Amino acid sequence: MPQIRPSVLVAGLVTALLSTLAAAPSFADPVAAPEAQQTSRTDVAARTTSARAALTPRTRFTMKPDGSSGRTVGGEGIPNIDSVKKTIATYYGDQGSGTASKTTSPYISEVQSILRRQSATLQSRYDKALRQHKGKRPALVFDTDDTTLFTYDMEVKAMHFTFDPELQDEWVQDERFPATPAMAAYVRQAKAVGYTIVGITGRSAAQESATLGNLAKVGYGDAFTDPNFYTKWSGAKPSYITCKVATACTTVEYKAGTRRYLEKKRDLTIVASYGDQWSDLMGGHADHSVKLPNPTYYLPSANLPGKKQRELAPRTHFTMAPDGSSGTYVSGEGIPNIDSVKKTIATYYGDPGDGTADKSRSPYIAELKKLVKEQRRSLESRYRAAVRRGEKPALVFDSDDTTLFTYDMEVKAMHFTFDPELQDEWVQDERFPATPLMVDYVNQARALGYTVFGLTGRNDTQKQATLANLAEVGYAEGTFTSAHFFTKWVSGSTPPAWIEGCAGGSTCTTVEYKSKTRAHIEHDLGYTVVASYGDQYSDLVGGYADHAVKLPNPTYYLP
């Protein structure tokens, strides 16, 4: 069996990686060194280790919580949203059903650790408050969602990380939420010490009765009572709340203003405030702030004028393995918050907030321009070199987010949750625009003489619609042809003859399917794959291409 030719160039990565490649000509330029010009296969074999190392996702990220990093970090520098979901699932002990473990998980362990530390000082802080604030009653203030009541199952199984206020109200009115792990016992302990227990929640006044009922039902007993439970008002705001925009108070204005009222008018001294959002805690009027972990949503709010509180700010640096395994050992704050990831992705694609990408100008398009410009520099020379060697030069292209652009489907239609039936509608209706810059590039390659192959994870029933979509958006006639366009066989059908030896029998991984098909293009059809192009690393690994060109895509991950 011929030796696999591993990929030897990755393009389209973040600037730092491109700079690394440029600084290492023995890897980045297959014809730079005289000894590497003996044969293509000698050259490729010499670079196996470097090539494989390059064809792996990033694991370190810098991301601001407001999404602004999408303007500067590049596609590979944005945490991939599917990897974020897997990391969150691991952290919460979710086995894939969208429900969190209620008995053991890294999340439960972290919350228990936080509350053990708090429990150790409950009595001493209570006594200190009595001494320092004579005539005032020591109090603890608690947020509700993911502070006292646990919303993971609603957020993930029911909503798939896309908030639905009507569905949320159903869960609230039906009192479906379990207690946040270890929190009910902690609140009962605090009440037994003598603390006044106060709830301040972003839930509406219409949800107060059901929320109190839910809290009592899951173990808080009578710790939370109507006089000491504050919800967002309907109608006129309370007189003790001061807001910059009177008709639209921020979370910090509402919660800090309520804490101020409790201390100034209710004769309480707030020893500690507890919340899962930084905006639950900002604005002062509490001796201590206790942040509970929650990477499943982010509710930002500006701090009050003059308040710095730099310690009450989200993380901006993260380490995350693509397979989700980081959820076993990083803290909740060490997981990229999924709402911040979504905002960063939207910024990167020029999405104004409606789930559609800008088709003319965005950081994503700017990155593709650089990538295509870089590839064009060697497009003709690589073709001529292959012809001089007596080879038939070919290029292999993936479809989704390589030649056809799926952002609007993935985000506006699916909200980052893949739906195979909806995807098939889009495919059969030929709804996809071209991936920016790729039409001219592919057509140029075809005009130079390259044979162009398509190699997609779409299935055989989608082949004709995909070819029609490609033609419709401008890929020149004869560029993508049925004979040179490979789709996956449908379940129950026989794989092509060249697909054999997959670890799962007739069920092949993406890497097995695509690398074996590239081997078929080379060894059975007689072509040399000069370059393979894809938005997923699994499009590219496995060899049988002189160069691997990675397009950026943080919107899904197919390992």
Regions found by a protein language model. Give the residues of each.
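Asp-based phosphoryl-transfer active-site loop
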Residues: 138-151, 199, 393-406, 454
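Structured segments of extracytoplasmic/periplasmic soluble domains
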Residues: 117, 121-128, 151-155, 186-196, ...
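Substrate-recognition element of Asp-dependent hydrolases with the DxDx(T/V) motif
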Residues: 146, 183-216, 230-231, 401, ...
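Non-catalytic pre-domain segments flanking phosphatase-related domains
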Residues: 2-142, 306-397
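Surface-exposed patches in mature extracellular/periplasmic domains of secreted proteins
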Residues: 125-139, 195-203, 227, 271-273, ...
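Active-site neighborhood of HAD-like aspartate-dependent phosphohydrolases
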Residues: 148-182, 388-389, 403-436
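Second-shell loop/turn segments in exported
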Residues: 74, 97-109, 169-177, 198-203, ...
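C-terminal cap/substrate-recognition subdomain and adjoining C-terminal extension
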Residues: 37, 43-56, 206-343, 359, ...
